[in-house]
C-alpha cells in the first residue's frame, strides 16, 4: 500500500512538472503565444482543467498560470519610452560608425511598440474582464472601462510622435548652437509639473538659470496649459498674478475672487487676467481640438517661484483641506468625521473617484453646464478681466502681416497689476517684420504656429565664448563688454511651434517667416508700465529718416542723399515687407560704391 502511494506521488509530481514546462514554453515555432501572454495563459488553464485530477490540483495549476501571466504582463508593460532611452544608451557603447544604424533600429522598434501598445493593452484588459467577472452587467462595465482607458485617448500617439520628431529635427551642430544662445529656449526647456492622460501643465525654466543676462526678468515665469477635448481642469489658486492668453481651441475660464465670480467663453486671442489668490477652473468645450493657453506668472511671495493650491484632489494633486487636522475640519465645517471621509482625498472618496490628477474627463452635458452664463470678451473695455486681442484694430498692418498690441495704459484692469503688455503678430510666408527695438520693455516671444527665424543684435556676446551661460565668468564678461563697447554679435535662432525667444530692451531685432508657411507669434512685454516705445530702423517710418542732414553725413561719411537712397528706398511698405529679389540690390553693391558700408549693414536684415 505504501509502495502504491509512493508511485502515485511520483507520477503526480511528474505531471505537475510537465505542466509547468508546458506553461513556461516560449519558443515553439509558429505559435502566436510568443507575442500574446494572455493566450498562453488561456491555453495553460485549459490544460489544467483537462489533465489534472481534483479541484485542489487544478486550482494550484491555474494559480501558477496566473502568476506567470502577471509577471509577463509586468515585463511587457514597461514604459516604451524608458526602453527606448535604454536602447539609445546601449548604442553609445558601439563604435562611432555603427551608432547611427543602432539608433535607427531603436527608433523603429519604439515606433512598432507604440503602434501595438494601445490595442494590445485593450485586448488583454478585455480578456481579463471575460474570466474575472461572472455577472454580465459587470463584464459590460469592465469592458467599457478598458475602452475608456486604452482607446479613448487619440492624442497619446500624437504626443509621442511629437517627441520623436523633436529628437530628430535638429543636427548635433545645430543643437549646440541653440544651447549656446542665452535668448533662445527650445520647447523642451519647459518642465512638466503635471503630465496626465487628459492634459499637461509645463513651466519654462527660470530665466536666470539659462543665463545671467536674463536675471532682470527672473521674477516672471512662463507656462503652457493644454487640456484635451471635453476635459475639466480642477479648481485651484496660485500665489501669483497671472495672464492667460488662449492660443488654440475654445473653452470656458471661470474664477472666483473674494467678491464675485467671473466666467468667460474663450477662443484664440482672448486674454484673461487671473488675480492672485483667485480660485480658477477651466473646461475645454471642443470635441476635437485641444485647449492651449500660454500663461504669464508674476509671483507675489518669492520672485520667480509660484505654487498651485488645490482644495479638491486625491494624491497628485493633493487636497490642501486634508492637511488640516481632523479636529479643525470637524469644527469649521460643523460636520461628522464620516462626512469628512466623503471629501476629496478622504477614505471613502478613493473608491468613487473617477480619476486622479489636475485634468479630468467630463461629459458633454457637464461641459455645456459649465459654459452657461459665461460671457464672450470683446476687443476693448475698461471693465472686466478679459478682452479679445485679435478683435482689436491691428497696431501695424499691411498685405505682409499684422501686429496686435494691448498695453497697461489702455487695459489697466487687465494688465496693470502684472506690468506687462500682450502682443500677437502674424507674418505671412516669405515676409519680414522689419528691424526695430523697444525702448523699455523686454519681450518674451512664443511661437504659436509656423516656422521662421529671428535675428538680433547683441553687445553682450561680441566675444566668442564656449559657454555663455557660465556664472563663474560673469564678472569678467561684464567688464570686457564695457571695455569693448560698440562691438556686437548677430544672434540667430530657428523658430518653430513651441519655441521661445527673449528680446531685451534696446536690442535691434527682426523676425522672418519661412518661404513655405506663415509665422504666428505671441509676446509678453515685461515692465511695459513704463510706457515702452517701439523704434523702427527700417521701413517707411524708420528712425534714420528723421535725422538732420549733417548728422547723416557725419555718421555715415557720405552725402546725405546716399543715406536717404538706402533708408528711403522702400517708401510704400512699412513694418512688414515681403522677401524680394536681391539681384538689383547686389548690382548696386560694388567694391567702388560709396554705399557699400551700409548696404552691408542693410543686408544684415
From Swiss-Prot:
Annotated Cupin type-1 domain residues: 183-341, 387-564
Region ranges (Disordered): 52-81, 157-181, 465-485
Signal peptide: 1-23
Cell compartment(s), UniProt: Vacuole, Aleurone grain; Vacuole
Any one of the GO CC terms: vacuole
Functional note: Seed storage protein.
Primary subcellular site in the record, as a coarse category: other
Bias kind Acidic residues: ranges: 166-175
Keywords carried by this UniProt record: Seed storage protein, Signal, Storage protein, Vacuole
Pfam families xrefs: Cupin_1, Vicilin_N
Keyword Signal set for record: yes
UniProt-recorded name of the protein: Vicilin GC72-A
